[in-house]
Amino acid sequence: MFRLAWLRELIGEPAGGHEAPPVEPVAGMRFAPGPVLIACASQTGVAEDLAAATREQLRAVGIVSRVADFEALDRAMLETASQVLFLVSTTCDGDPPDMAATFSRTTMAQPASLAPLRYGLLALGDRGYEDFCGFGRALDAWLQASGAQAWFPRIEVDDEDAAALERWHAQVAALAAPVAAQRDHPCQAERPA
């Protein structure tokens, strides 16, 4: 059911008559010029659907992005990326999805050099398991140990919780707002303060 509401919101239709509260990114945090990598690790397709919706959200405001699944993701790709949105699910009791198993076992085995990297992380899980969002939490800890800086605290989703997904959407929108404003009003960006 959340998927329909999410897609309606993307195309501008009301999604049940309530809006997510405005969210501001961490002071000074916003998307930089250049493409955004959207990395997803999915077992059942939910993270892939959300990655596609996030890409569409960015495209709608003129931000170039590309989606890559964790099978294509490696240390070198992350070390050269400057901004990444991670959408990852956890399977069973804290395990990564099959497509992220190699990444988890090899790439995350030790910290990388990711100081220039800025990221957002949406962790999907099920509170019915003891290690809720275990892979998302492990990825977040590894990114921080590698020197990457989060734009906002990790957002955890319990079984496709609509409120958590709205927070994700709002955070992405807040990061994109300065880019959208500059696109809509390019002359204002050039005026001295």
Language-model-derived ranges and their functions:
Residues L58-M77:
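A short, well-structured beta->alpha microelement
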Residues R55-E56, W151:
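Short amphipathic alpha-helical segments with coiled-coil-like heptad repeat character
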Residues A39:
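Conserved active-site segments centered on acidic
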Residues M1-P35, G45-V46, V61, T80-A81, ...:
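FMN-binding flavodoxin-like domain, especially the glycine-rich phosphate-binding loop
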